[in-house]
Each structure stands twice: as C-alpha cells, then as structure tokens.
Amino acid sequence: MNIFREACRWICNPTASKKAPSERLPGGIDWHCHILPGVDDGFQEVKKSLEMLCLYEGAGMRDVWLTPHIMEDVPNETTHLRQVFANFQKQYQQDFAKRNPADRKMLRLHLAAENMLDALFEKRLKANDLLPLGEDGKLLLVETSIFSAPMNFHALLERIKNKGYTPVLAHPERYLYMEKRDYGKLKLMGIKFQRNAFSIDGQYGKKVQKRCKWLMKHDMYDMVGSDMHRLSIFWQYW
C-alpha cells in the first residue's frame, strides 16, 4: 500500500473513513496506544508518529493517551518517558503550527503506561513510581501474559486498589486463559476493562473476536483504545 497516497486521500476526504471516530473510539478518546516514538515495540520514528496524529486529527479525535509498555523486558523509567513525552509534545505542537490546518483542532496528548503485572511492576507499585491513566490520575492500565495470569493476580489487583488506583485491564478479550466466569469475578472486584478497538474486526483472530463480542453483549467494557503500534493498522481497520 502507498501510505503517502492513502494519507493524501484521507486528508482531502476525511469522510472516506470506514468508521466514524465515535464508533471506533467513543468520545474521540484513544485510551491505549503505542504512538510515543522509540520507547517500545510501537512507533519508532517521530515522523511516523506525527503522521498518525495528523490522521487522528482528520478523524475528529480529541484526546490521545500515549501508553508505552513498562515490563521486565522493556524496563522504561518513568522519568525517561516523561522527558520523551515532553519532547514529542513540543514536536507535535510545532508540526501542527507549521501545517496550520484551518478545519482541525490540535489533539490533547497525555502520558500514561501499560504495565505488565510482573516483578518489576510490584517494585514500582511499592515505590509509587507509576504513570497513571485518566484526568484525575486514579486509573492504572495493566496487562498480563496472553497465555497465563500471574500466580498472585487477584491479590496484586487488590494491592493496586489499596494504593488508591482502579485497575484497568487492557484488552481482556485477548487473554486465552480467561473463561466467562473469570471476567465476572474481575468485574465484581471493580476492575475496569479496556477493549482494543479492532478486536471486533478480527485483528487477533476469530476466537478473540468472539470473546470480544460476548464482552460487548454483556456490557463489560468501560473504555476503548486502539493499541496502535504502526500506521498500517490504521489503514487496515479504521
């Protein structure tokens, strides 16, 4: 696919989108993405990240939560992420001013993190060295391995709550070890669920798609994120 040609098509005709932003990401808010460049397995180049934000503007988005991974395999320091975010925010402001689009509004960018529930997270939680989600800083985006939960999964979620945070479980539809009753138990604990926007389209396969539909049917999701790692995902599924 010629990304430049597709970008021109989008910019000239934003209504060419398959889905309105309110359908894909309700309220024009992306609660989970990997657009912050060069910090994890997501976007690597500032240029590509800026292109992604330009596309989001054209789609009518309002807020974007940049949520890079923090885990033992990707041990991002919160101080480093804050600095990268501050620099990127300046680059975006400069890019927007240079483009000066009369019919668009600048996106509001926010920094949080997607936290793997592992030994590193337990250390960070104890030290309160975290990047929470939400305007009031009371939400904490967490994930587990796709294949198995940590042995102390529920106890760790309770520890998060005791620290004053509400855990938000990223893409619960993707966890192969979870059964319907597991989702119910988590909701009874007060855990919020964040759906990946393109799970419903089969991005992760039919089993995940089916689980996503079931969770939607039972109104278990609280927020939606793109989990965007690269531009091609936008063109394929939006």
Where are the language model's segments positioned?
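Non-catalytic positions within long, well-ordered alpha-helices that form the structural scaffold/packing
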Residues: 57, 161, 216-217
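His/Asp/Glu-enriched short active-site or ligand-binding loop at hydrolase and phosphoryl-transfer sites
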Residues: 191-202
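Short acidic/histidine-rich active-site segments
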Residues: 69, 218-236
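Extended substrate/RNA-proximal surfaces in nucleic-acid metabolism proteins
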Residues: 2, 75-193
